[in-house]
Swiss-Prot record:
PANTHER family: PARATHYROID HORMONE_PARATHYROID HORMONE-RELATED PEPTIDE RECEPTOR (PTHR45620:SF27), PDF RECEPTOR-LIKE PROTEIN-RELATED (PTHR45620). It is a multi-pass membrane protein. Gene3D superfamilies: GPCR, family 2, extracellular hormone receptor domain, Rhodopsin 7-helix transmembrane proteins. It comes from the Eukaryota. Disulfide bonds join 48-114, 105-145, 128-167. A motif (Important for interaction with G proteins) lies at residues 468-471. Pfam families: 7tm_2 (PF00002), HRM (PF02793). This is Parathyroid hormone/parathyroid hormone-related peptide receptor.
Amino acid sequence: MGAPRISHSLALLLCCSVLSSVYALVDADDVITKEEQIILLRNAQAQCEQRLKEVLRVPELAESAKDWMSRSAKTKKEKPAEKLYSQAEESREVSDRSRLQDGFCLPEWDNIVCWPAGVPGKVVAVPCPDYIYDFNHKGRAYRRCDSNGSWELVPGNNRTWANYSECVKFLTNETREREVFDRLGMIYTVGYSISLGSLTVAVLILGYFRRLHCTRNYIHMHLFVSFMLRAVSIFIKDAVLYSGVSTDEIERITEEELRAFTEPPPADKAGFVGCRVAVTVFLYFLTTNYYWILVEGLYLHSLIFMAFFSEKKYLWGFTLFGWGLPAVFVAVWVTVRATLANTECWDLSSGNKKWIIQVPILAAIVVNFILFINIIRVLATKLRETNAGRCDTRQQYRKLLKSTLVLMPLFGVHYIVFMATPYTEVSGILWQVQMHYEMLFNSFQGFFVAIIYCFCNGEVQAEIKKSWSRWTLALDFKRKARSGSSTYSYGPMVSHTSVTNVGPRGGLALSLSPRLAPGAGASANGHHQLPGYVKHGSISENSLPSSGPEPGTKDDGYLNGSGLYEPMVGEQPPPLLEEERETVM
């Protein structure tokens, strides 16, 4: 009774998490790029210029610093100003009660912040804008309005003075954000590289050995290739999007460079073609990876719950589903972006248009999770039936846990964990935990899948052992041939005989040849007439001992010995299920 209760409770808990986080996952913007930052700055500039026109047209409008900033940016939690700017609070109070009058510093846009009107002789403080993603949103930017009613200039430079030191703390080496980003980049780069290498070896192994060519391994190969293409597309996208400046250059960004982001875009948009292609390819392979994970779940679920299952018939359907359906979603997204939001590089979220890609991915995750829960339910029920009357419940729970852990990488269950907690700021312990978790599991998932479903597969290990035995025996034969001797095998025994001493053994050869050699043209060497004789260099598969169970033979249990598909007394297990045993062993 314990195992079913555990599985039902787990299903209820995680299903509630999925349902409560549908909108959160789809609406979350995980990454912001340079192009998106430029768009956000230009949008803020347009809003600010609109407000400036209204104020200049109707000077009687009351404009406080707080109300002014709320028009162009979401005000964050205020942080106490430094002692140097103790007059800033008084300036805001005066500004709140004042109207735009003669002698006041005019409101303006400095390509970073929309500044309100300034009181002569006072310091104006505004929150660091949240539309600049990497700013410290708890800090403030400062300007001083001199007694003449004009903004204070930088000495020796015809430029308005402004202090953004609290906003640009992310640009210094004194903060830990730089270390966090470097560590995250290293994690996913190493993870995708290891996954790419291991998956390449796994695909070569499954494709090289003909005895491993079957429907389930074909599906495994498609899944491996989807992980490989996802990793390659991520590397290409990063190279195209983030190759403009290096990390050291980013740390030396100045206010002038931030202001330069709002310059008009170039008239020629051909430079964005490569970026758009890279983003489109990345989104396609990302979607295909999720759908091939779903195909694995559908295939295993079909073997368990369908009495008649034609593997060859469904293989073509699975292939079209895994590679074709994502192409439809991506094609629709490309069409919408090209017609309705053809701006800059297409890595921008562009509002609700991102639902075209994210909703199908979310649907694949939810459906695969439901299949996973259903299979675990059947596994728990089978364990209860096979262990009826036994008192060892620890072993039962151990088998259930082991089988669950094996299935989790295949079904992508780890995607569910942080679906309900999308991050909105690049800060905080929760954000760091979430990012490390996602980067670790997403990048290493391909490696885990290759280990479990290829390198730890019994059939794969048996074929590798056979191939290794053939190669070593052939190499040994060639070495002996060069040294002038031959090696012979008599069943389990091996004899090394010098070529000069080899000759016909009359009595033995004559007595064995009528029974073992059908023709009179038998070799003069008596070794050819002995039972079990195999000469090195000509080893056949039948001469080697069996290295593992064949697909149709009975094993000790399915799903790592859990006994999910152990037949009842007098019951013959379906051949497809017996063949599928090695998938999760």
